[in-house]
């Protein structure tokens, strides 16, 4: 579940498309892990700088874009992790506009 930049975004999208929100979430958490930009050594890949840019020196914007695309894929395809509750309103796909509420990873509306 490691990786940096575009590879994390790509993996989030793949797990979301496979309907596995739990594994997609693990990668999102890796992407959002705070990184000290001045640290000389990092044990694991991934993470975000304090400005939320992807930590792949200097940075890879496609990592940020890929992870957000993966989150949209999770919401569109219903690959919701059990710990997620909330609602999505007006998420546009080529064929539809999606709005629903969800609790503990399950749609309620």
Please identify what each model-predicted range represents:
Residues 1-23:
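Long, repeat-rich segments with strong aromatic
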Residues 22-109:
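Non-catalytic C-terminal accessory modules of carbohydrate-active enzymes
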């Amino acid at each position: 579940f490691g990786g940096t930049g575009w590879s994390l975004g790509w993996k989030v999208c793949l797990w979301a498309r496979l309907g596995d929100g739990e594994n997609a979430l693990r990668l999102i958490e890796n992407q959002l892990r705070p990184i000290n930009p001045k640290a000389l050594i990092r044990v694991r890949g991934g993470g975000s700088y304090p400005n939320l840019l992807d930590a792949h020196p200097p940075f890879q914007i496609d990592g940020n874009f890929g992870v957000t695309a993966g989150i949209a894929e999770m919401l569109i395809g219903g690959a919701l992790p059990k710990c997620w509750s909330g609602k999505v309103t007006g998420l546009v796909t080529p064929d539809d506009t999606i709005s629903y509420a969800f609790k503990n990873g399950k749609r309620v509306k």
